[in-house]
Design a protein with these regions (language model features):
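Active-site and adjacent substrate-binding regions of carbohydrate-active enzymes
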Residues: 1-674
Length: 674
């Protein structure tokens, strides 16, 4: 690929030369299929995909990968811990945007070895407004089922089998795969109804809370028990057991699956399970009970109902807005969600205080076991810990020793406990990617967030570079801070390019310039991990707001109500048409393929280190430097060639990559040292 953009369209190039690009991948000349647009990739015929993978992987490996009863080993199996994540370049995929797990495999054909890990956004059955982060069960979301794959391989006739073989294929392609771990559910999920004691309840009359006693779950269990008595069990089982046998996790007579079948019905009966869940929810609501909505940021606790603000649903239920008694800057209440009750309360919750010395151990055991079962069943290599910034202890982060997990930290944070549980079961490489934003102390969680990240043993964290314009003071300060943390703390901040949360019309201004620089630095600053959301490589600049269907954030939920004009979507996700950016992304990928063995994972030596005001940055590898990388974060000043050559010194360097033909702003270059 030369430095100038093609005269014919990328679609024409693909039609004319697709067999050449496929052969480069099939014969291991490249680790991805060059010049394959994502929108073309996800439309590839299933048999075409099988043919490509058969020639790439071999018949035996492909057959094994397509058997859900067999497992392709993780490419990370030789690792003894999760530290590999600290230098991983990750791609985040909302499956709803590409419709099926098998389409993740198709999209992965466009992703080279230089982006080695794939984070799959939540895979569970969604709840209110179809929110992926408001799961109603640990069942896999049936909307991610591929009819095309099932027709080609009739034995792959469930979404669970398709997820397993998709991860098998991704492993065979050299990718690690991560799942979202969510410490909350929909407010009336199957989990809430099956295990009322695992959640926090309130009783209200109209728009007023009349009780928030810790023991309210017993009254809710009674309501559910009476419903089953009136309507029978969902699977026809006779009620030959006690109420406590049904609800108590300490009585091991019923398995989780049996309990859920008794209350809701068989997993495959989606409509029947939904009907039972809504009927039970209605009984509970009619008697004045509901789960406490989830909160974020200090003070976390102390809520009241705004009796004037509510939503009326189709059944006539009023869903009131909850508010903080004493809100702070980032205090949020998430009305559709409820968090697991991880700790007992003090004084029967009279003052909304949790007793952090008294964990509800059955809840911790349950969520650790359920996420481990998912890891084992499908073969996930790492977890993204949703809302990892939550730290509700008003006294801040306790002082811990690294070796004291079993004695002091086992019940500190659920995400930490899940990671350690999975590792202890024989998956030592299982890693933890934390959703935190590296903000100042006491802002999104009590105490120092950096200390919290170390206490929960997160290998890497998302950070917040995606939330500012490249080259601004805010962006530069974040980058300088993050790189310092990379070298001085036990976790690695990501150079985050874009996330599904930020692919949102409210944040278009962040991505109207310098997208090529974001990708360049994320790729070639090889001692810092990076994160890129699906579709960035073709994302439109959105100088004016695009259609809702162009934003992947609006597919995190599923809203068909036309009255919600900013969120409603009609039909599938629409890929961007920024083919000029894609061409330059491909050029960077092609060059990275060629030089990767000389730079991957190596420490950086700054030749010109960035600061708040020094926006031109120049670096090479600390060991055996063969290439020099230049990136100009400034939008005001062009690149200073004299300064570059002064910085390079007396080395003989040859320019091999330059983005000037693409844009005279935010120029990026690579020099080869000879």
């Amino acid at each position: 690929m030369n430095g100038v953009e093609p005269q014919q369209s990328l679609f024409d190039l693909w039609r004319q030369y697709h067999y050449v690009y496929k052969e480069q991948y099939q014969s291991h000349q490249t680790s991805y299929i060059p010049n394959l647009l994502p929108e073309i990739a996800v439309q590839l015929n299933v048999y075409d995909v099988f043919g490509i993978l058969q020639r790439r992987l071999g018949t035996e490996t492909l057959q094994k990968a397509l058997d859900p009863n067999q497992t392709i080993d993780s490419p990370l199996k030789h690792h003894t811990d999760g530290s590999w994540l600290k230098k991983s370049n990750m791609v985040g995929i909302n499956v709803r945007t590409i419709q099926s797990f098998f389409n993740v495999v198709k999209y992965a054909l466009t992703i080279p070895k230089t982006q080695d890990s794939i984070h799959i956004l939540p895979i569970w059955e969604p709840g209110v407004v179809g929110s992926l982060y408001g799961k109603v069960s640990f069942n896999i979301n049936p909307e991610f089922y591929s009819e095309e794959l099932a027709r080609a391989v009739p034995s792959l006739n469930t979404v669970e089998k398709q997820l397993k073989v998709s991860i098998n294929l991704l492993h065979a392609m050299g990718k690690s795969v991560g799942m979202d771990v969510i410490p909350h559910t929909d407010r009336f999920s199957e989990l809430v109804i099956a295990y009322p004691r695992f959640f926090e309840w309130v009783r209200r009359v109209g728009g007023r809370i009349t009780s928030n006693s810790e023991s309210l779950y017993r009254e809710v269990e009674e309501i559910i028990w009476h419903y089953i008595g009136r309507n029978g069990t969902a699977n026809g089982t006779s009620l030959s057991f006690s109420k406590n046998t049904l609800f108590s996790p300490e009585i091991p007579i019923l398995t989780d699956a049996q309990r859920l079948e008794i209350i809701f019905g068989h997993v495959s009966d989606v409509k029947g399970r939904l009907r039972r869940r809504i009927e039970i929810m209605q009984d509970i609501i009619n008697q004045g009970y509901e789960t406490l909505p989830m909160t974020m940021a200090p003070p976390y606790r102390g809520l009241h109902i705004n009796s004037e603000d509510y939503i009326l649903d189709e059944n006539g239920n009023r869903w009131y807005t909850y508010e903080f008694d004493e809100p702070q800057a980032m205090s949020r209440v998430f009305g559709p969600l409820t968090r697991y009750k991880l700790f007992h309360s003090k004084d029967d919750n009279a003052n909304w205080q949790l007793d952090f010395d008294n964990p509800q151990k059955c809840v911790w055991d349950y969520i650790c076991r359920k996420y481990y079962e998912c890891q084992q069943r499908f073969g996930f290599d790492f977890m993204r810990g949703d809302m990892a910034h939550i730290q509700p202890r008003p006294d801040g982060v306790p002082t811990f020793q690294v070796s004291d997990f079993e004695t002091n930290r086992k019940y500190y944070d659920p995400l930490l406990s899940i990671k350690k549980f999975v590792q202890k079961q024989g998956v030592p490489y299982f890693a933890f990617f934390a959703e935190t934003f590296l903000v100042e102390p006491d802002f999104m969680g009590y105490g120092d967030e950096l200390a919290h990240l170390e206490a929960i043993e997160a290998e890497a964290t998302l950070g917040d570079l995606q939330s500012s314009v490249v080259g601004t003071g805010e962006f530069m300060q974040k980058f300088v801070d993050y790189y310092r943390y990379l070298k001085t703390r036990q976790f690695a901040p990501n150079y985050t390019i874009i996330t599904a949360d930020k692919d949102d019309p409210r944040f278009d201004e962040f991505y109207r310039t310098a997208n090529h620089l974001r990708f360049f630095v994320g790729l070639f600053l090889t001692d810092m991990p990076s994160y890129m959301g699906l579709g960035f490589e073709v994302r439109n600049l959105h100088i004016e707001r695009g259609a809702n269907e162009e934003y992947s954030k609006l597919y995190v939920f599923s809203i068909q109500d036309n009255a919600q004009t900013d969120k409603v979507t009609h039909g599938p996700f629409v890929w961007g048409q920024n083919y000029s950016l894609f061409w330059w992304v491909e050029k960077m990928r092609e060059l990275a393929e060629r030089i990767w063995d000389d730079v991957v994972g190596k420490s950086t030596e700054w030749l010109l280190e960035p600061t708040l005001n020094q926006k031109l940055m120049i670096w090479t590898t600390a060991e055996n430097p063969k290439y020099i990388f230049v990136a100009n974060n400034s939008s005001e000043y062009g690149i200073n060639d004299e300064l570059i050559w002064q910085t390079i010194g007396n080395q003989t360097a040859h320019l091999i990559f330059d983005t000037t033909p693409y844009s005279d702003q935010h120029i990026c270059r690579i020099y080869e040292v000879r």
